[in-house]
Amino acid sequence: MSFRASVSGGPGRMAPMERTIDLRSDTVTQPTHSMRRAMAEAAVGDDVYGEDPTVNRLEERAAALMERESALLVPSGTMANQIAVNLLSRRGQEVIGESRCHIFNFEHGAMAAISGALPHPIETANGILHPDQLRTAYLPPGGHTNSSCMVALENTHNLAGGRVVPPARMDELVGTAGELGLPVHLDGARIHNAAAAVGVSAARLARGCDTVMFCLSKGLGAPVGSLLIGDRELIAEARVVRKMLGGGMRQAGVLAAAGLVAFDEVLPRLADDHATARRLAELIAEVAGILLDPATVETNIICFALDGSAGMTAAELADRLGEKGVLASALGANLVRMVTHYHITMPDAEAAAAALREVVAERATG
């Protein structure tokens, strides 16, 4: 049985299309009609000269959204993270972060290769650091060991299943880092999902962090871009590092235009994606051989494990789901990730769960 769906809807009214149910990531989103129109009509200039009016508007809105002085558009979240590390770290010193964070695991060792910084990973049960763990990990300058230079936080935490670091814990971590004399960078690729989940502003969650970045091309649905945000002096330095890394773009207003539409059309409805994810999680949890507590699904990411009775690896499960028109990501031997976004409807969630149930049942009957 195929679970491919024909849908029409989403912000800006996506054109109807026959498609698979793509739950691999929220990066698979297609630009809305409104985004495409805004991109085609965008006023542009040379952004390396600071002359692209649409980029300037996007950066001003992003800075205001985060209640900061300045923002910088860069091609990707990885580049934004690496610019921040370059500005806040020192060669041969350690960046303290949760062991599964994106900066440590999905950026190909860039902080070591580019900035000479070393990871100091801290393991947690749920992706959320405790201030005492920062104190224990901290290494002062001097002596015979590496020393700590900064703290990297992630909110929401991708590999922890989209868990939200709540405002009070963010305050504690930022405060502890300050006591230790360490600057803080927040990888807020999905910070707007975190904000929607706990009912506060993204600026509130990032309060006190020296730099914060968020992505336009995940749940917000724009095709390209992330923003690095901080004080005016730091972002002026970031502009130089962006150029060094090859991230200076010319008529980038065609990309920035989609981001402006995302702020208006997509950001206000992120909670809908969370509701879809919760429903999908509830249905997945009913499938034999699946280990998942739906209460842990706080945003748009679902991570579930396979127990021994499932009789297959995560990769095998993902392959069989793909044959039924449902795409998911295998993370290691027994962990599967699904991510909802504005293309995924409640009927899609139900169809995806039905496909999963069918795959597991087929395996059980041999």
Short names for language-model regions:
Residues 3-4, 15-324, 329-344, 350-366:
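Conserved PLP-enzyme active-site core in the AAT-like
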